[in-house]
């Protein structure tokens, strides 16, 4: 285990050195938040990939491969590529033209201050909840490792304390280099984290394959189900009428339709209207470099997802030949971390742990930087101190990083407590679903910006509120991904019209009230 600890210590030392080195010569908020718009596109590309692959993906995608034993999840990459092409061609140039630091400044220039404040607040709340929930995943491997090393079978309260300790350790380390170095530290540490992630996953694949007796012949023999190895699914069935076919298609998560409709709109929202992801694209020298980074990242998503899913498939085959090595009650999400701790040799195990830490810290640093930047630009400078000096802005954004870190630790700890006491909960759906309530409406607002028509701030905000209420009225819908696209289209269609009369505004408010009454209570 000393070799593993050595690998992890070297990783942390490298991260801190990069973060401190990157934090030199920062004289303005633009330097801190956008790296003075001077970062190379390939570094931004690596940073996008590192931010996308959270701890939830690192553990959840192999879990999907283990459970489904096919590659249908990967077809969603069709939509992610299309969505990024649209983002690069439609959104990035206006952001550069207006020289925004917070993308919600762009909404103010198009629709007024009220729209900017509304979108900014929605982002802050939803990002704290979503990133805090995802932070929980980073603690899973560390908790399993502690139990493996000590041989202690902890009770529920002890497990929660272990999670909290793990989340605090990861968050404090990430907060230090993020607060000191700003976006430059985030991007350049992400480059290292992307390399560590890639090497660790390829190492896991090599070990898995070498531990399966018989190699490919054994893998083929174990994978003999009707849906095994499948790449594409239309979601249709035999002997069903048109309506039944439609219901069946909409009720499935991974289909070609979900790829073209759901994944495309979701990617447009995540990479075009979310400060968390757009901020690094704005650090490129110009919009063309930012566009190149985001589109190439979409192309690389496909092989990355294939590697994660294939890892899960090999995990299934490995435990088919070694059933005694895996406890029968092991949750799907814990299969990969259990393999890492119990099966990998020294050194490679440390590399995989470093890989998980890389995914967690990459996503966390991105969230902290974007939250602090948005709060500083939209609220501290925008409302409380418009005349703030650059030194005051830098102090605010650094303290904001620490404050948001505490909030994310709090949300992550609550999530850990809830999952430990309710193990049947699918926390990945909760983490992803938080943004499902807001992404479609936010995307609709930004799409309205792409038209020559200038809606009033009141019409945009009222329509945005209506869309949120409509989405909240159907929280258990199985068509969550498609609802995001419907939300965006509805928001775009209605938001392009002005509310000229009191009667029209009254009608929208009445519709809001009826939807609020329809929404189930918590």
Give the role of each language-model region.
Residues 110-117, 128, 160-165, 376-422:
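Loop-to-transmembrane helix boundary motifs in multi-pass membrane proteins
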Residues 34-39, 43, 60-75, 108, ...:
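Loop-to-helix junctions at membrane interfaces in multi-pass transport proteins
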Residues 1-30, 101-104, 108-143, 165-228, ...:
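Membrane-interface loop-to-helix entry segments
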Residues 2-23, 35, 39, 43, ...:
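Extracellular loop-to-transmembrane helix junctions
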Residues 40-48, 82-83, 87, 113-126, ...:
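Select transmembrane alpha-helical segments in multipass membrane proteins
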Residues 28-45, 163, 183-185, 430-461, ...:
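C-terminal membrane-solvent junction of multi-pass transporters and transport-like membrane proteins
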Residues 31-36, 63-64, 89-97, 104-110, ...:
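Helix-loop junctions at the membrane interface of multi-pass solute transporters
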Residues 71-179, 241, 245, 262-270, ...:
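Helix-loop-helix module between adjacent transmembrane segments
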